[in-house]
């Protein structure tokens, strides 16, 4: 496999986000593109990242399916070295993954491949009563502001408006999002409510560096789905299970 990433900074933030949930992962490489998926150790979050071949400026595969196992910590330690104008070339053989930054000067790093057990993805064929579309930066800024106020994020919808609420020990914070005030691009669905672990939701906000817009789906006592849209119809999906209490 050989793939050239023009926006290496954005790519690095995608993998940093994955690294907040998983310690090890596989690049599943086919002629269609690269997929990374997995379930976090607490089994609260299932993530599914897909970067189509058109996401890359150059994309070469030598076999029908290639599985590239790696430790997120090792890859992210390298990706933290990326500079603003760098391009990134990913290449692999049977034993190693090579990351090459090409910018003002060229730097190459090699990592040994590891065996990562493939996880069976859960069934995510869900009917979501409510859907909203918004800018990723809007979502990330709101969650960042609320994240230190409490451990539980309450989400509810009413009359096509979306509400984020956190009840802390000393105060309660509530944010209204709607198409009227410009915080939602689109919204439709039923009046529903559910609660999710704030830490899991907050760990997705690094995607703002890679994604301009996103979709949010939820319903009463079903997983929250966050779809971060990526260039060339790529996406980053995060399914977060509701809190039981």
From Swiss-Prot:
Q: Which GO terms describe its biological process?
A: leading strand elongation; regulation of DNA replication
Which CDD domains does this one have? PCNA
Keyword DNA-binding assigned to the entry: answer is yes
**InterPro entries given for it?**
DNA_clamp_sf (IPR046938), Pr_cel_nuc_antig (IPR000730), Pr_cel_nuc_antig_C (IPR022649), Pr_cel_nuc_antig_CS (IPR022659), Pr_cel_nuc_antig_N (IPR022648)
Q: Which UniProt keywords apply?
A: DNA replication, DNA-binding
GO-annotated molecular function: DNA binding; DNA polymerase processivity factor activity
| Record-linked SUPFAM superfamilies | DNA clamp
Q: How does it assemble?
A: Forms homodimers with PCNA1, which then recruit PCNA3; does not form homotrimers. The heterodimers interact with RfcS homotetramers. Heterotrimer which circularizes head-to-tail (head is at N-terminus, tail is at C-terminus) to form a toroid; DNA passes through its center. Replication factor C (RFC) is required to load the toroid on the DNA. This subunit interacts with DNA polymerase I (dpo1). The heterotrimer also interacts with flap endonuclease 1, DNA ligase and XPF via the other subunits.
Similarity-based family: Belongs to the PCNA family.
Q: What does this protein do?
A: One of the sliding clamp subunits that acts as a moving platform for DNA processing. Responsible for tethering the catalytic subunit of DNA polymerase to DNA during high-speed replication. Heterotrimer stimulates the Holliday junction resolvase Hjc. DNA polymerase I, DNA ligase and the flap endonuclease may be constitutively associated with the PCNA heterotrimer forming a scanning complex able to couple DNA synthesis and Okazaki fragment maturation.
From the Swiss-Prot or TrEMBL record, give the protein name: DNA polymerase sliding clamp 2
This protein's species is: Saccharolobus solfataricus (strain ATCC 35092 / DSM 1617 / JCM 11322 / P2)
Q: Which gene encodes it?
A: pcn2
């Amino acid at each position: 496999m050989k793939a050239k990433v023009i926006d290496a900074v954005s790519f690095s933030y995608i993998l940093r986000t994955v690294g907040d949930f998983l310690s090890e992962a596989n690049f599943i490489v086919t002629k269609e593109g690269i997929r990374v998926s997995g379930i976090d150790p607490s089994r609260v979050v299932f993530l599914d990242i897909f970067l189509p071949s058109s996401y890359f400026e150059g994309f070469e595969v030598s076999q029908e399916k290639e599985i590239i196992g790696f430790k997120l910590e090792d890859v992210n330690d390298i990706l933290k070295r990326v500079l603003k104008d760098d391009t990134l070339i990913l290449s692999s053989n049977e034993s190693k993954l090579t990351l090459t930054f090409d910018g003002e000067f060229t730097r190459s790093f090699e990592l040994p491949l590891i065996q990562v057990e493939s996880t069976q993805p859960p069934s995510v064929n869900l009917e979501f009563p409510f859907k909203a579309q918004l800018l990723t930066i809007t979502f990330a800024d709101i969650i960042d502001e609320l994240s230190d106020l409490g451990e539980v994020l309450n989400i509810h919808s009413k009359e096509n408006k979306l509400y984020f609420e956190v009840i802390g020990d000393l105060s309660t914070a509530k944010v209204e999002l709607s198409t009227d005030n410009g915080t939602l691009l689109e919204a439709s669905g039923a009046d529903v409510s559910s609660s999710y672990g704030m830490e899991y939701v907050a760990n997705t906000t690094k995607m703002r560096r890679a994604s301009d817009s996103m979709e949010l789906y939820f319903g009463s006592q079903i997983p929250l789905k966050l779809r971060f849209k990526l260039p060339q119809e790529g996406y980053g999906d995060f399914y977060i299970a509701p809190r039981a209490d």
